[in-house]
């Protein structure tokens, strides 16, 4: 079928659309389904309609959007690696939020599976991981709140090892400005990556991925390895300083974003 192989389960776009559809369908079902059987049949009809529309219509549309993003990234890199580093470095982790980065990963895998190729895209992605870790590190240093420090310390280590979700969802996105300042650090790091023409021969990024920047053909430490460390350290410093100075303060804890659990098609929160 037209949806075979379309892995859009890791993007939040279908979830957002499903929630919106449910909010529109549920009042209509209340009017048309008799009250005596409403509690039994309304949820079934709602789930069937919403799931069908998401799987058949909106999911494939998300994959088409992902394809445009992939082609755009490749075009920018082919046009100018420096510009690509700036743009991708600043925006890649935003793609992660919406799950659209899964469109880029197969491109990276295809590049690395070809024995003669390296991946410039992945070299840029690597510094974006460090940038989010730098934001979490700044929060860990600046905050006086023990709970935040307990979150920020492990999140920093995780991001520096290539897993950014704890830093992003646990801290940087929750205190909005921190994500922006960290992303600016990623943009600067990506710019430096492009300026130094850094190539990458492996999949693992961030600091733990440093062996991936050793030229696998010659086995020697060349300009890409040196460029990786320069770009990574620049990213760390810029992301840390911007977040420390402008991205976070403990008073933000009073207005942190709260997420309430809701049932599909219902507006009122569910009691925990």
Model-derived features with residue positions:
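Hydrophobic core segments of alpha-helical transmembrane domains in multi-pass membrane transport
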Residues: 12-24, 46-56, 89-94, 131-138, ...
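Core mid-bundle transmembrane helix pairs that form the ion/substrate translocation pathway
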Residues: 26-99
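Transmembrane alpha-helical segments and their short flanking loops
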Residues: 146, 154, 166-272
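Helix-loop-helix junctions within the multi-pass membrane cores of secondary transporters/permeases
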Residues: 105, 109-186
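Interfacial loop/helix-cap signal at membrane boundaries in integral membrane proteins
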Residues: 1-12, 213-220
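Transmembrane alpha-helix interface/packing and boundary motifs in multi-pass membrane proteins
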Residues: 89-101, 112-117, 158-161, 193
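Juxtamembrane interface elements at the cytosolic ends of transmembrane helices
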Residues: 16-34, 58-66, 103-105, 242, ...
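Structural signature of hydrophobic alpha-helical transmembrane segments
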Residues: 5-17, 71-73, 79-81, 122-126
């Amino acid at each position: 079928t037209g949806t075979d192989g379309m892995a859009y389960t890791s993007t939040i776009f279908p979830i957002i659309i499903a929630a919106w559809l449910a909010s529109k369908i549920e009042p209509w079902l209340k009017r048309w389904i008799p009250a005596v059987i409403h509690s039994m049949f309304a949820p079934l009809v709602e789930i069937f309609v919403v799931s069908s529309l998401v799987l058949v219509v909106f999911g494939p549309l998300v994959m088409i959007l992902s394809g445009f993003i992939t082609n755009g990234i490749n075009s920018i890199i082919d046009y100018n690696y420096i510009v690509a580093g700036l743009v991708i470095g600043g925006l890649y982790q935003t793609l992660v939020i919406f799950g659209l980065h899964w469109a880029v990963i197969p491109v990276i895998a295809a590049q690395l599976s070809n024995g003669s190729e390296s991946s410039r895209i992945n070299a840029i992605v690597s510094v974006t991981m460090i940038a989010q870790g730098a934001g979490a590190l700044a929060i860990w240093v600046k905050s006086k709140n023990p709970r935040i420090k307990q979150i920020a310390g492990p999140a920093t280590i995780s991001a520096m090892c290539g897993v950014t979700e704890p830093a992003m969802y646990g801290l940087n996105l929750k205190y909005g400005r921190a994500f922006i300042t960290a992303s600016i650090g990623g943009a600067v790091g990506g710019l430096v990556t492009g300026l130094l023409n850094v190539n990458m021969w492996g999949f693992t990024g961030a600091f733990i991925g440093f062996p991936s920047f050793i030229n696998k053909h010659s086995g020697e430490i060349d300009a890409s390895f040196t460029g990786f460390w320069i770009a990574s350290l620049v990213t760390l410093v810029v992301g840390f300083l911007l977040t420390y100075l402008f991205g976070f303060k403990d008073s933000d804890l009073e207005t942190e974003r709260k997420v309430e659990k809701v049932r599909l098609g219902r507006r009122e929160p569910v009691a925990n």
